C-alpha cells in the first residue's frame, strides 16, 4: 500500500530505511528575494528503536544552539525533533554540505569541553530543572564516535 504524499518532508521519509547517526538535507527553499533556506536532518538515534532522554536532549539543544554560532554565522536555528531522535539545523544562504559536517564536528567537540549548560536557569529557560551536562556530553561523544558515518543515510 502506497503512503499518501504529505506536506511535511520528514513524514515522506521512510524511517525504516535510514541508519542513524546521519546528517542529510531535509529541505531547500528559495525565498522571493533569492534567499536560500536549507534544513538539515541531524539524526542521533535510530528511529523507532532508540531516543534521547529529555534532560540530555534539552541540554544538547542549549549547548549546540549557543556554540554552533561561534563556527557559523549563517545558522538560523537548531531545534529538537519531537520524536527525540535528532535535531533540525536550519541555515540561510549556505549550501555546502561538507562544511556543515565540519561545523557540526567542531561544535560537538566544543560540547565535550563545556563546563555548564548555557541558559539553564529559570530566567532563560522554560524548564530549567530539566538539564544534564553529562548527558549532553554523552550524546555528543556518541555522535562524534560515528563521524565517518554521518553521510550514510541509508535511504
Curated annotation (Swiss-Prot):
What GO molecular functions are on record for this protein? iron ion binding; S-ribosylhomocysteine lyase activity
Provide the binding site for Fe cation.
58, 62, 125
Iron keyword on record: yes
Q: Which cofactor does it need?
A: Fe cation
Q: Per its UniProt record, what InterPro entries does this chain match?
A: LuxS_sf, Metalloenz_LuxS/M16, S-ribosylhomocysteinase
- Quaternary assembly: Homodimer.
Q: Name one GO cellular component term.
A: cytosol
Entry keyword Iron: yes
- Give UniProt keywords alphabetically: Autoinducer synthesis, Iron, Lyase, Metal-binding, Quorum sensing
**Coiled-coil intervals, chain numbering:** none
Task: Return the broad EC class.
Answer: lyase
Q: What does this protein do?
A: Involved in the synthesis of autoinducer 2 (AI-2) which is secreted by bacteria and is used to communicate both the cell density and the metabolic potential of the environment. The regulation of gene expression in response to changes in cell density is called quorum sensing. Catalyzes the transformation of S-ribosylhomocysteine (RHC) to homocysteine (HC) and 4,5-dihydroxy-2,3-pentadione (DPD).
Per the record, the domain of life is Bacteria
Which Enzyme Commission number(s) are listed?
4.4.1.21
Organism, per UniProt?
A: Helicobacter pylori (strain ATCC 700392 / 26695) (Campylobacter pylori)
What does the cofactor field's note say?
A: Binds 1 Fe cation per subunit.
* Protein family membership: Belongs to the LuxS family.
Q: Catalyzes what?
A: S-(5-deoxy-D-ribos-5-yl)-L-homocysteine = (S)-4,5-dihydroxypentane-2,3-dione + L-homocysteine
Q: What is this protein called?
A: S-ribosylhomocysteine lyase
**Stored NCBIfam families:** PRK02260.1-4
Classification via Pfam families: LuxS
Instruction: Tell me the GO BP annotations in alphabetical order.
Output: L-methionine salvage from S-adenosylmethionine; quorum sensing
Amino acid at each position: 500500500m502506497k503512503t499518501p504524499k504529505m506536506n511535511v518532508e520528514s513524514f515522506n521519509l521512510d524511517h525504516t530505511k535510514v541508519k542513524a547517526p546521519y546528517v542529510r538535507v531535509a529541505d531547500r527553499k528559495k525565498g522571493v528575494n533569492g534567499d536560500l533556506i536549507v534544513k538539515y536532518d541531524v539524526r542521533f538515534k535510530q528511529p523507532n528503536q532508540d531516543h534521547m532522554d529529555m534532560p540530555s536532549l534539552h541540554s544538547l539543544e542549549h549547548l549546540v544552539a549557543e556554540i554552533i554560532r561561534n563556527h557559523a554565522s549563517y545558522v538560523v536555528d537548531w531545534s529538537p525533533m519531537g520524536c527525540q531522535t535528532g535535531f533540525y539545523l536550519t541555515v540561510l544562504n549556505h549550501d555546502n554540505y561538507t562544511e556543515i559536517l565540519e561545523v557540526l564536528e567542531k561544535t560537538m567537540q566544543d560540547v565535550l569541553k563545556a563546563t555548564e549548560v548555557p541558559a539553564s536557569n529559570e530566567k532563560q529557560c522554560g524548564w530549567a530543572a530539566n538539564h544534564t551536562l553529562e548527558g549532553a556530553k554523552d550524546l555528543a561523544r556518541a555522535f562524534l564516535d560515528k563521524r565517518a558515518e554521518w553521510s550514510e543515510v541509508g535511504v
